[in-house]
Amino acid sequence: MEQYEKVEKIGEGTYGVVYKARDRVTDETIALKKIRLEQEDEGVPSTAIREISLLKEMQHRNIVRLQDVVHSEKRLYLVFEYLDLDLKKHMDSSPEFVKDPRQVKMFLYQILCGIAYCHSHRVLHRDLKPQNLLIDRRTNSLKLADFGLARAFGIPVRTFTHEVVTLWYRAPEILLGSRHYSTPVDVWSVGCLFAEMVNRRPLFPGDSEIDELFKIFRILGTPNEETWPGVTALPDFKSTFPKWPPKDLATMVPNLDAAGLNLLSSMLSLDPSKRITARIAVEHEYFKDIKFVP
């Protein structure tokens, strides 16, 4: 650890404290994530090993880079590139952001590129939210951070833990108790982020699982076997749910053009099997005017 000098604590991560720090060798500013090991008799928690193994494989311009792993008997530190701005802070502090549809488009494109890359490596993110989308102020490039809850998924998709995605960005199949979800859960979250960037407020700000579901159904309509085959068999589906008709998405996201609305509605399909994939979404006509040099 002699190589790294802590500068200040910048937050509490899923598994421990995050510090801003300096690399004494290169003089580079880095983010140091300290993983708590005290409760673990076996040493390094499997959650951290999973995060490390995933992140070491993840080499992409839109993924936060894991630079080093420092391990001692009682401590585990992950060394990441340092970015001090996240999408939540950026939206809160930049009133001009909402007036710049190109900026929204550029950010959305980069989120989708990062997610498409993850999915191509059989990795779900599962915890997408504005706080873990980091922005490089100099280049305006956006990177996905915090793979704390991600895990590699094989085919067939295994049963996953229930608590993964922050409520406002949580896909309806998870809210309805599905144990066999896959990559569409991330695409749903990206759709929620897209609408939030355009509207400057969350689309489905539920304060409980049922409130979240009902906020979704009030806008997109209550699903049934016709619109989502198999939905009534999900563990938490109730035949007593109010039967709301779908609203026109254009009234909910009025500042979005036709191509944007088409993309958004294909990301917010209630039936996960009908949801667009990240790989196909990056080719959508909404992005046709983007000249993005990799």
UniProtKB/Swiss-Prot annotation:
Enumerate the Gene Ontology biological process terms. cell division; G1/S transition of mitotic cell cycle; regulation of G2/M transition of mitotic cell cycle; regulation of meiotic cell cycle; signal transduction
Question: What does the record give as EC number?
Answer: 2.7.11.22, 2.7.11.23
Question: What Pfam family is a match, any one?
Answer: Pkinase
Q: What are the entry keywords?
A: ATP-binding, Cell cycle, Cell division, Kinase, Mitosis, Nucleotide-binding, Phosphoprotein, Serine/threonine-protein kinase, Transferase
Q: Indicate the residues that form the catalytic site.
A: 127 (proton acceptor)
Main enzyme class = transferase
The PTM Phosphotyrosine maps to 15
How its function is modulated: the record gives: Phosphorylation at Thr-14 or Tyr-15 inactivates the enzyme, while phosphorylation at Thr-161 activates it.
The function of this protein is: Plays a key role in the control of the eukaryotic cell cycle. Component of the kinase complex that phosphorylates the repetitive C-terminus of RNA polymerase II.
Q: What is this protein called?
A: Cell division control protein 2 homolog
Specify the taxonomic lineage: Eukaryota, Viridiplantae, Streptophyta, Embryophyta, Tracheophyta
Gene label: CDC2
